[in-house]
Curated annotation (Swiss-Prot):
Disulfide bonds: none annotated. HAMAP family: PyrE (MF_01208). Orotate binds at residues 34-35, 128, 156. One of its GO terms (biological process) is 'de novo' UMP biosynthetic process. The gene is pyrE. The keyword Glycosyltransferase applies. Homodimer. This is Orotate phosphoribosyltransferase. The keyword Metal-binding does not apply. 5-phospho-alpha-D-ribose 1-diphosphate binds at residues 26, 72-73, 99-100, 103, 105, 124-132. GO terms for molecular function: magnesium ion binding; orotate phosphoribosyltransferase activity. One of its GO terms (cellular component) is cytoplasm. It comes from Proteus mirabilis (strain HI4320). Its EC number is 2.4.2.10.
Length: 214
C-alpha cells in the first residue's frame, strides 16, 4: 500500500467517514464497515481529498483532458482534484459538471464549466448502483468526447445481485476502466497491520468472503 492510500484511510477514520460495527445497507446486507464520504466536509478535508484523487490519476497514467463531476457529490471532488493537479503536478486540467435540471436563462444548458472534449475522467465518491455514473457516461457520449476512466474513493469489491460488482458491470457495459484511491483489499491490509483496529479484521474478511468479487 502506498503512503497516500494509508493517509486516506487514516483521514477517513479520523473524520468518521469510515466506521466499523454492524450496518444494514440498502441491499439488506449487514456490513461490518460503513463509508460515508459526505463527512469529508471541511476545506482541509477537500484539499487532502483532491491530492489523493490526483495522485491516483497520476499513478494509473489515466489520459485526462477534462474532469467531470456528476451532480451533486462529484462537483466538489472534480473541483478539488483540478486544484490538486495544478498545485502538485503542474497539470492545468479543465473541469465540468452537470446540473440536475436544465437552465433556460443565462448560459443555459445542463453543463457548467469546461466543454466536454477529448479524454474525460469521471470523478465521484463511491459506486452503489452506478446510476449517476451511467448518466454521466451518456452525457459524455452525447458530446462526442471519450470516456478514459472513472475515479472513485473506495471500491467495495462487492457483488451486486449477480456475480459482478456494480463497478465490473460498468466496465463491461462501457468498456472503461474504474480506478479507486483504495479497495476493500487495501482496507483489509491496513487492518492486518493495525494494533488498534485488528479486532475488526475477522468480520471484514468474512464479509469479503461471502459477498466479495473474485
Amino acid at each position: 500500500m502506498k503512503a497516500y492510500q494509508r493517509h486516506f484511510i487514516e483521514l477517513a477514520l479520523a473524520k468518521n467517514v469510515l466506521k466499523f460495527g454492524e450496518f444494514t445497507l440498502k441491499s439488506g446486507r449487514v456490513s461490518p464497515y460503513f463509508f460515508n464520504a459526505g463527512l469529508f466536509n471541511t476545506g482541509r478535508d477537500l484539499a487532502l481529498l483532491g491530492q489523493f484523487y490526483a495522485q491516483t490519476l497520476i499513478d494509473n497514467h489515466v489520459p485526462c483532458d477534462v474532469l467531470f463531476g456528476p451532480a451533486y457529490k462529484g462537483i466538489p471532488i472534480a473541483t478539488t482534484t483540478a486544484v490538486a493537479l495544478v498545485e502538485h503536478h503542474d497539470m492545468d486540467v479543465p473541469y465540468c459538471f452537470n446540473r440536475k435540471e436544465a437552465k433556460d436563462h443565462g448560459e443555459g444548458g445542463t453543463l457548467v464549466g469546461s466543454p466536454l472534449t477529448g479524454n474525460v475522467v469521471i470523478v465521484d465518491d463511491v459506486i452503489t448502483a452506478g446510476t449517476a455514473i451511467r448518466e454521466s457516461m451518456e452525457i459524455i457520449k452525447q458530446h462526442d468526447a471519450t470516456l478514459s476512466g472513472v475515479l472513485l474513493s473506495l471500491d467495495r469489491q462487492e457483488k451486486g445481485r449477480g456475480s459482478l460488482s456494480a463497478i465490473q458491470e460498468l466496465e463491461r457495459d462501457y468498456q472503461c476502466q474504474v480506478y479507486s484511491i483504495i479497495t476493500l483489499d487495501d482496507l483489509i491490509s491496513y487492518l492486518t497491520e493495525s494494533e488498534t483496529l485488528s479486532a475488526h479484521l475477522p468480520a471484514v474478511k468474512a464479509y469479503r468472503e461471502r459477498y466479495g468479487i473474485n
